[in-house]
Amino acid sequence: MTPEQYVQDKAAKSGSSFYYAFRFLPLPQRAAITAFYAFCREIDDVVDEVVDPSVAAIKLAWWRKEVANAYDGRSSHPAMQALMPHTAAYGIEASHLLAVIEGCEMDLQQSRYLDFAGLARYCHLVAGVVGEVASNIFG
């Protein structure tokens, strides 16, 4: 299976309507957003599906290394392999991907925010950064 097939399958199996909306985009944008969406699903699935928070934290640490490796030209995960050809064209920086990981990691540490600043930070990391990347891709 190619990295491109992997991210297509990941997006299709997610059950999200995003997958169908992406089908109407021009091919370069569709490929970029599908790869980015698959990356985000991978990260979110760690937090949602791994029961032991310490195991989830280890997996997220692995993803941090994978992001660094990918930007050094050494990606091993098909989601990153599918995403990397689009990073320069759409301004997708390692900091964007690391922010998504950081935001999802916050789910392991707390489920409720006691102040607006903490909530705003969480929302920025798990949704705002995703919107920034999507707007870069969509133009």
Predicted region positions:
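Acidic catalytic motifs of isoprenoid enzymes
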Residues: 1-139
